[in-house]
């Protein structure tokens, strides 16, 4: 028997085909809910993303802030998967909880550790908004603790929770340590306008060569955002807040990256 399912599977990409993103992020979520119902699972926890708020919103956003489909396929499919889950709740099919993580980093993080290190090593990494976009890191262990609390707390049913750091840091402050790990100077920061032009060219070249370019215009826009997220609801309802400092989380991540051979480039 299974009492709670935590649905973490998703394609996290700004470059994959729309059809693949829809199949995995949306249709598979519906299929998973159907399977959960068949086996009388009580609660379904959907791991969504802060991208649900869109890229154009500014300032501190709580769970009551409207969502906005103003991004690429990742934004659209994460929003659509939330709709699937909330519809199941509204139809009394299953008890649901939605968690919207911030920029989750740590050992194994492809978008925020592995991919940037690979791009920096190849001298293919630049920051838009002159490195002043907002980054809302959450160390993976803190996120896992929060998800566990959301999965088990009796009052969490039907609720949505932001889980990120308190406040924000600039993208420059986040990515600078990765340059240091590789013994390089950086990051290189340019205007968003220039970054969009460069990323558009890179995406066209990727299309021509049949490769994926995660440094797409959608990623540029994402790294230029000026919003951060209130975590007061998770603090008050779940008794959760981040415990791992950024410095500690990055030190653990550095050791992991070294052990994986990611810094020998």
Annotate each predicted stretch with a short phrase.
Residues 23, 55-104, 125:
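Catalytic helix-loop patch of NAD(P)-dependent Rossmann-fold dehydrogenases
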Residues 88-135, 140-141, 178:
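NAD(P)-dependent short-chain dehydrogenase/reductase
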Residues 229-237, 241, 245-265:
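Amphipathic terminal alpha-helices
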Residues 1-27, 35, 53:
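NAD(P)H-binding glycine-rich loop region in Rossmannoid oxidoreductase-like domains
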Residues 27, 31-73:
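Conserved Rossmann-fold NAD(P)-dependent oxidoreductase catalytic core, especially the SDR/UDP-sugar
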Residues 140, 176, 200-241:
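Conserved C-terminal active-site "lid" loop/helix of NAD(P)H-dependent oxidoreductases
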Residues 79, 92-94, 105-115, 141, ...:
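Glycine/proline-rich active-site loop of Rossmann-fold NAD(P)-dependent oxidoreductases
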Residues 149-215, 247, 251-254, 262-265:
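Mid/C-terminal beta-alpha module of Rossmann-like enzyme folds, strongest
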């Amino acid at each position: 028997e299974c009492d709670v399912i935590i649905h973490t599977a998703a394609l996290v990409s700004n470059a994959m085909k729309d059809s693949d993103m829809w199949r995995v992020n949306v249709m598979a979520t519906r299929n998973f809910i159907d399977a959960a119902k068949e086996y009388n699972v009580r609660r379904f926890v959907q791991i969504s993303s802060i991208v649900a708020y869109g890229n154009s919103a500014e300032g501190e956003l709580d769970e009551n802030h409207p969502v906005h489909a103003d991004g690429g396929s990742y934004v659209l499919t994460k929003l659509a998967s939330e709709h699937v889950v909330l519809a199941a709740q509204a139809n009394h099919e299953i008890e649901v909880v939605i968690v919207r993580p911030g920029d989750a980093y740590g050992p194994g993080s492809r978008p925020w550790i592995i991919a940037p290190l690979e791009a920096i090593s190849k001298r293919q990494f630049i920051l838009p908004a002159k490195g002043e976009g907002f980054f809302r890191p959450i160390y993976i262990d803190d996120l896992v603790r929060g998800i566990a609390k959301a999965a088990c707390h009796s009052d969490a049913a039907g609720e949505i929770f932001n889980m990120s750091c308190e406040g924000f840091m600039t993208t420059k402050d986040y990515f600078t340590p990765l340059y240091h790990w590789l013994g390089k100077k950086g990051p290189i920061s340019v205007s968003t306008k220039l970054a969009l032009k460069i990323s558009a060219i890179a995406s066209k070249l990727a299309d021509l060569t049949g490769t994926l370019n995660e440094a797409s215009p959608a990623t540029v826009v994402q790294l230029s955002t000026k919003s951060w997220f209130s975590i007061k609801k998770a603090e008050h309802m779940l008794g959760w807040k981040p415990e791992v400092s950024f410095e500690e989380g990055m030190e653990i991540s550095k050791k992991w990256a070294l052990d994986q051979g990611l810094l020998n480039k």
